[in-house]
């Protein structure tokens, strides 16, 4: 029975790792959406003339912003999103490796249980 408790513990570890991996995948999708949105904003800002008026939404109020300041802000946002995406990708890689190792561990335990069950069944036949 101690083996079965250990097995359940390992299965729960695997489930936890898989849930964490899904959170990272969701985070990556959100980053990709933010990146796309920011790239679109940058493209629009790049098309503007230097004397164009730019407004920034703060709460429910539109506030005038300098074009160069807006471009700089978007550029910094793109850099931040890029670094966060790299961090999330590294985390996904790490947790995927851990999931694979844990899945192998659980499968090996299952094989051991099956072999013990077969051995017990064979012993009963004799």
UniProtKB/Swiss-Prot annotation:
Keywords: Chaperone, Cytoplasm. Expressed in embryonic blastomeres and gonads. One of its GO terms (cellular component) is cytoplasm. GO terms for molecular function: protein-folding chaperone binding; unfolded protein binding. InterPro entries: PFD_beta-like, Prefoldin. It is found in: Cytoplasm. Pfam families: Prefoldin_2. One of its GO terms (biological process) is protein folding. Disruption phenotype: Abnormal locomotion, abnormal morphology, slow growth, defects in distal tip cell migration, defects in developing gonads, and in extreme cases embryonic lethal. Heterohexamer of two PFD-alpha type and four PFD-beta type subunits. Belongs to the prefoldin subunit beta family. Binds specifically to cytosolic chaperonin (c-CPN) and transfers target proteins to it. Binds to nascent polypeptide chain and promotes folding in an environment in which there are many competing pathways for nonnative proteins. Required for positioning of the mitotic spindle. This is Probable prefoldin subunit 6. It comes from Caenorhabditis elegans.
């Amino acid at each position: 029975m101690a083996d079965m408790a250990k097995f359940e513990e390992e299965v729960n570890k695997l489930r936890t790792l898989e849930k964490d991996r899904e959170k990272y995948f969701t985070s990556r999708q959100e980053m990709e959406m933010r990146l796309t949105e920011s790239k679109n904003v940058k493209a629009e800002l790049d098309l503007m003339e230097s004397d164009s008026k730019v407004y920034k939404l703060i709460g429910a109020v539109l506030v005038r912003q300098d074009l160069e300041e807006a471009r700089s802000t978007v550029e910094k946002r793109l850099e931040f999103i890029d670094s966060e995406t790299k961090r999330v990708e590294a985390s996904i890689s790490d947790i995927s490796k851990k999931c694979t190792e844990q899945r192998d561990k659980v499968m090996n335990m299952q094989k051991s249980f099956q072999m013990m069950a077969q051995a017990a069944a064979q012993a009963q036949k004799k």
